[in-house]
């Protein structure tokens, strides 16, 4: 049943998606296979079993367009899903634009971001196969928070290697993870061989997602009843997130709207893919423009090289065909910690390579300027990562004003910034670098 006003477009719980969408069958060409780090041969399912459960490996390699969402997962999704699609009317008025701006609000989840969409699914499949503990990495802490939330619901333990600069910048993310029973370790650490090696070479390193991934994988591989879980990049992670875009499609249909522009921020690609992949065929047909926004300090899609590379610093992961800045790249310590990744999802990279998706990079200060305007018009404080999407949406709305076009702009609001207020304090005090 329709429950909406001009501000919010809502779906009933019964309208929540029953299947995830898998983009693999709709890519412009077959995806180059991941390669085994030791043999350089295509990875086989059994190669991944030391760190992933069989259920997720099957999803990773599935060619099926639609994958059923288990009812136990949908039951947990109902805690916060469906999420609202919101009309940003006050922002439109502030910009004096004829464009209509909508944002899909993923900050409604208990951890405050889109990340639980896959965290709950991954915890479910691991628990189903008897896994007792998960290890993972996290940048800004949103993914780590989501996995701690999910593992607690399935009575599992969780160890999170948090990039050191974010561990220092965002202490309340650590508190959130510990509240849900998680163990949080600043990375690099002395808990792993790779961590000790990096600390010996550079004791003052701010850390990176690539380093934290190496530590989490090493931990999982060396301990019984433990698997590794990740918050982005791989296809099974991205397909879990497509509940975002599938709901958005249904919500736009409720008000007879069709998007002209879809926008999302990009670190590894999960939030972006979740919103945009259900619309990929429309973009291939030229019916809309899809824009991926990344930080200029970590310009993977706009300045990276399209080639095989490791997903982590130590070279423990399979080699993935993607745009990459190099697996040993250490980005500047920007506040958008969730976007500080050297690579991107191979499916996203292929779509960028073929021109289905356009990429742009933005500097840090303009993103906070956009986030502040959004907070002062719409009332919600965006996460630093989300500010990248807000920036691009504002830029597109200004362009529509200049061209006098009534465009429909939809962007993904990946998470709120209530645990990122130090970043806003730094911005308001003039302490942020324009990297």
Curated annotation (Swiss-Prot):
CDD domains: Trp-synth_B. GO terms for molecular function: L-serine hydro-lyase (adding indole, L-tryptophan-forming) activity; pyridoxal phosphate binding; tryptophan synthase activity. Pathway: Amino-acid biosynthesis; L-tryptophan biosynthesis; L-tryptophan from chorismate: step 5/5. Coiled coil: none annotated. Keywords: Amino-acid biosynthesis, Aromatic amino acid biosynthesis, Lyase, Pyridoxal phosphate, Tryptophan biosynthesis. GO terms for cellular component: cytoplasm. PROSITE patterns: TRP_SYNTHASE_BETA (PS00168). Its EC number is 4.2.1.20. It comes from the Archaea. Pfam families: PALP. It catalyses: (1S,2R)-1-C-(indol-3-yl)glycerol 3-phosphate + L-serine = D-glyceraldehyde 3-phosphate + L-tryptophan + H2O. Its cofactor is pyridoxal 5'-phosphate. The modification N6-(pyridoxal phosphate)lysine is found at residue 115. NCBIfam families: PRK12391.1, trpB_rel. PANTHER family: TRYPTOPHAN SYNTHASE (PTHR48077:SF6), TRYPTOPHAN SYNTHASE-RELATED (PTHR48077). HAMAP family: Trp_synth_beta (MF_00133). Tetramer of two alpha and two beta chains. Belongs to the TrpB family. This is Tryptophan synthase beta chain 2. The gene is trpB2.
